[in-house]
Amino acid sequence: MEESGSGYEGKWEKRWHPLRREWIVYAAHRNNRPWDFDIKEMVHNAPVFDPKCYLCPGNTRVSGEQNPQYPDVFIFENDHPVVGLHSPSISDQEKFSHERFYRREKAEGIAKVVCYDPRHNVTLTDLDTASIAKVFMALREEMIFFRNHPSIKSVLIFENKGEIVGVSNPHPHCQIYATDFVFNVVQKELHAMRLHQEETGRNIFADIIAAEKKDEIRIIAENESAIAFIPFFARFAYETYIFPKKPHQSLITMNDEELAGLADVYRTVTRKFDANFKSVFPYILAFDQAPVDGGDYGG
């Protein structure tokens, strides 16, 4: 049945996601559906120091270790790690069950916590650009360490910000999962990158940036070395990509100036979100990087 002139024209479409190689369904009219979220819940109202916080300077963590009186970035191994270097071994007989339908292996790796700042009541967005860049530089040093670690193949750096996304401790921090395997989402992106290179001879990320700069309307922030935009193929509302303009496999090859540019764009984007929602805007932040297993990933 035709809906010509009914007002439904252009409301549904699917867009190709070049990194995931799958279709993303868009239904623009759903932006008008009711939204009952109470924005007051996102107001940041914590003390500068919380004596019960296991991340604040001088406090004792659950491991019994006491935090130093750190002045800026502080990094330590997670007291409740999701992976470890001394995970129990699994025999060949135990690896498979149900006629080899189910399979398991030991999970090896290193989990760390990165505190951005000693103050309990700030966010990464609240810091000045130089301080954010210092955080990124500390993460770069961690990446270099893991690249040289024989047990590590891939590193996931991520931050969950806001109680609404499941944060149990508001002290400004992110986490690092360095693992002995490469996550599937990274493998999919590497596959897409190689296919694009073979088909066009070009870097897929450079082509994404070029397309967004040509359209212009989805760009949120930009400077000489970095750019942020909501991509044409975004899967979620407000999903934002922050890219260095030059190709890099990871933070490892980015110089201090580029990290400062990345910090500047990050700060601009997150402050705009805070201003738009008149709140401390919650998010999930992930650093999308190539594995550190010695492979050639072409930038």
Where do the protein language model's features map onto the residues?
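Active-site microenvironments that recognize anionic phosphate/pyrophosphate groups
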Residues: 1-171, 177-251, 257, 270-273, ...
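Acidic, glycine-rich loop-and-strand cores that form catalytic or ligand-binding grooves
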Residues: 264
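Detector for conserved single-position "signature" residues within domains
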Residues: 277
